[in-house]
A protein has these predicted regions:
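Short helix- or helix-capping micro-motifs
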Residues: 15, 38-49, 53, 64-66, ...
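Membrane-interface alpha helices of multi-pass inner-membrane proteins
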Residues: 42-46, 86-101, 111-113, 132-136, ...
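Transmembrane-embedded, aromatic-rich helix segments that form part
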Residues: 65, 89-90, 103-118, 155
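Membrane-proximal stem/loop segments at transmembrane-domain junctions that anchor or position
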Residues: 148-222
């Protein structure tokens, strides 16, 4: 495929995912509201800026939103119907979300803990979920250990955390650090050694910065 055709293909896939996300949102709503309210809520969801502008740019936001909604939809489905197929699909989507957004691992742990204490799913099926999730993420974890001698899932956890926890962050986050307000941070990033640990050290700078922001102003950032 030529570059332009490839871009159009990516845009088309993002549009499809964004459109299907609205339908997933509608299905999730039906667990709590009437059909009428579910349709109204889904329409409002369909016109929020995130669903519109991410389709016109090369971004992982569309697939992350799609997987997040699919995760919730499959969670409700699994609680109601504990079939092997639902267990496998839920586990695979959970693993993919952890690979897309490392911080989702925290959400997964809390979800897993809630399911465990509420006894929504028996222990055997919970163990199956953990095994499948581990199998999904293990190739990338092993790859990172071979290259960096560290057991890490993704190399952008710190940056993603900082995007949502800096003084310019809004609801959708703020990720531009090449500005005057973040001069010290920018200088630290520029001085990172370009060795095989570059990506890890680069991300750790943002992780430490985000952690400092949260510790100094926990009410604002936490």
């Amino acid at each position: 495929l030529k570059d332009s055709y490839f871009l159009y293909l990516v845009f088309f896939i993002q549009i499809v995912l964004s459109t299907y996300s609205v339908y997933l949102f509608y299905q999730i709503n039906q667990n709590f509201f009437s059909n009428k309210f579910s349709i109204i809520n889904s329409f409002i969801f369909s016109i929020i800026p995130l669903n519109i502008y991410t389709c016109g740019q090369i971004s992982s936001a569309s697939i992350q939103l799609f997987l997040s909604l699919l995760f919730l939809k499959l969670l409700f489905t699994l609680i109601k119907n504990k079939t092997q197929k639902n267990i496998i699909f839920f586990s695979i989507v959970s693993g993919l979300l952890i690979l897309c957004r490392g911080e989702f691992a925290i959400i997964f742990v809390f979800t897993f803990f809630f399911i465990f204490i509420s006894k929504k799913i028996d222990v055997i099926n919970l163990i199956k979920i953990l095994i499948i999730v581990f199998l999904v993420i293990s190739p990338y974890v092993i790859r990172n250990y071979i290259h960096f001698n560290q057991f890490i899932i993704v190399k952008s956890l710190g940056y993603n955390l900082w995007k949502g926890n800096n003084q310019l962050s809004k609801v959708e986050g703020y990720g531009k650090f090449e500005i005057v307000e973040f001069k010290n941070l920018h200088d630290k990033v520029k001085n990172v050694n370009k060795d095989k640990y570059y990506e890890i050290n680069w991300d750790n700078i943002f992780l430490n910065e985000a952690r400092d922001n949260i510790e100094k102003n926990p009410i604002i950032y936490a």
